[in-house]
Regions:
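Short, low-complexity N-terminal tether/leader segments at secretion or assembly junctions of large
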Residues: 1-18
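Cysteine-clustered segments with highest specificity for TGF-beta superfamily mature ligands
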Residues: 10-12, 218, 359-389
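Ligand-recognition surfaces built from glycine- and aromatic
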Residues: 20-41, 45, 199-278, 282, ...
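Secretory/extracellular carbohydrate-interaction modules
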Residues: 78-149, 260, 276-283, 287-318
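C-terminal interaction-tip segments
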Residues: 114-137, 207-210, 247, 251-255, ...
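Glycine-aromatic-enriched beta-strand/loop faces of beta-sandwich-type recognition domains
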Residues: 118-173, 338-359
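Localized edge beta-strand/strand-to-loop motifs within extracellular or lumenal beta-rich domains
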Residues: 169-187
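Extended, solvent-exposed segments with strong compositional bias
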Residues: 323-373
């Protein structure tokens, strides 16, 4: 029997090894560059489509239950039908681009009936403004697609002959790797084989993609309402930052003071992360970090979340200090004179998050630390704080870290 003794392990030499491609394989001090993956977002569908992690859309309308977007035997499955010819599964989070770090999107997919009439399937990262993704069209061919500033700037056929036995109708793993920095290259992989490169260095006079902080998106759509087999099956999905780390956040906060409340579930503060910034989808996520509550009476504050403005009555939402520091909006007249406080909320429609009980005139604080347990505010989300005091006066402060 042979073994490797701990005091004298086998020597390891990197001399003569191929250590990366190109000439930038060492840092400024001559230390070999090493790529360590750091997952920014991942999704699995073992039991269901987790609503806290994914949005579902049918015909452009967000839905909260669906018979066309389901979990089947651990896979997410999107299947069109008459009247539901455009389906989207989209991650809640838009993982931020980490400067000077590579981005890697990864998934596993299979697409039955690859030439189904009028059927188009897509998987990758995208919004209406930016994106890079695979597209399977009804000609049975795969395409590499890139979008910037709302315009599809590239749709290029992918040659798959180098992938042994490739069949898009069977389960394969797909990766998209890109450098960005505003002008880097994009590489498409199938089963770990490089099948297509968008070689852009030294060719552009604009950004290769106007926004690199994008959600994972899977789509199935058909121009023929009678086609019922336009489907995409998904194993899991991930966005990784190569050599990445915990994302830096920019501090923001909002407060409401001297808010008279009397009765159950009266609104004290509403926060809103707008769906759009200008005409583009807002991909900045805010993570709630700190909060404090006070009332002249012993009472309970409750924190809720919703995506429907119809659940809130009477409010006018304005970005604090005129949007100088953040696009996050609130109904606090203390933050902006143009705001109007909400007068009522329909709590039956809201997602309950947390409750804090305070003694009369004794401030209580609740922190939400940086961890894998996140309370986030993504594009289109509302956070509502309510109070149940009898003739009380409330003060609330919320602080958040925003991915900019």
């Amino acid at each position: 029997m042979s073994y490797i003794p701990l005091p004298n392990p086998l020597p390891v030499s990197l001399t003569g090894q191929t250590l990366g491609t190109g000439d930038l394989t060492e840092d400024a001090w001559g230390v070999q560059k090493v790529s360590l993956p750091y997952s920014l977002f991942h999704g699995m569908f073992t039991f269901d489509i987790p609503a806290k992690m994914w949005f579902m859309y049918e015909g452009g309308t967000q839905v909260y239950t669906s018979t066309n977007i389901v979990s089947t035997d651990g896979a997410a499955v999107l299947t069109t039908s008459a009247g539901k010819t455009a389906l989207i599964l989209e991650s809640r989070l838009c993982p931020p681009y980490q400067p000077n770090r590579g981005v890697l999107f990864s998934t596993a997919v299979w697409c039955p009936s690859k030439t189904a009439t009028g059927c188009v399937r897509e998987w990758g990262v995208q919004t209406s403004g930016s994106g890079v993704f695979f597209r399977l069209k009804s000609d049975g061919l795969l395409y590499a697609v890139r979008r910037s500033v709302g315009v599809e700037v590239a749709e290029e056929v992918i040659t798959t002959t180098g992938v042994s036995g490739f069949d898009v109708q069977k389960g394969n793993i797909y990766d998209i790797q890109y450098q960005w920095r505003g002008g880097g290259n994009y590489k498409f992989f199938i089963n770990n084989v490089l099948v297509h490169t968008m070689s852009l260095l030294g060719t552009l006079t604009a950004l290769s993609m106007s926004n690199p902080a994008l959600p994972i998106v899977f789509k199935a759509s058909t121009a023929d309402a009678g086609v019922a087999n336009c489907a995409i099956h998904i194993g899991c999905a991930d966005i990784t930052s190569e050599n990445g780390s915990i994302t830096e956040e920019q501090w923001g906060s909002a407060y409401a003071e001297n808010v008279a409340t009397n009765g159950a579930d009266k609104p004290v503060l509403v926060l809103h992360n707008p769906l759009l910034i200008g005409a583009m989808v807002n991909t900045r996520t805010a993570h709630l970090r700190t909060s404090s509550f006070n009332n002249t009476k012993k009472c309970t504050f409750k924190i809720w979340r919703t995506r429907s403005a119809g659940d809130i009555t009477g409010e006018t939402l304005v970005a604090g200090y005129g949007g100088k520091y953040s696009h996050i909006q609130s109904d606090s007249t203390n933050m902006n004179a143009g705001a109007v406080r909400a007068t009522a909320v329909t709590v039956a429609n809201l997602e309950f998050i947390y409750a804090v009980t305070v003694e009369a005139a004794v401030r209580s604080a609740q922190d939400f630390p940086v961890s894998h347990l996140e309370l986030n505010l993504v594009r289109g989300d509302y956070i509502v704080v309510t109070n149940d005091s009898v003739n009380g006066v409330s003060d609330v402060v919320f602080g958040w870290g925003e991915e900019v």
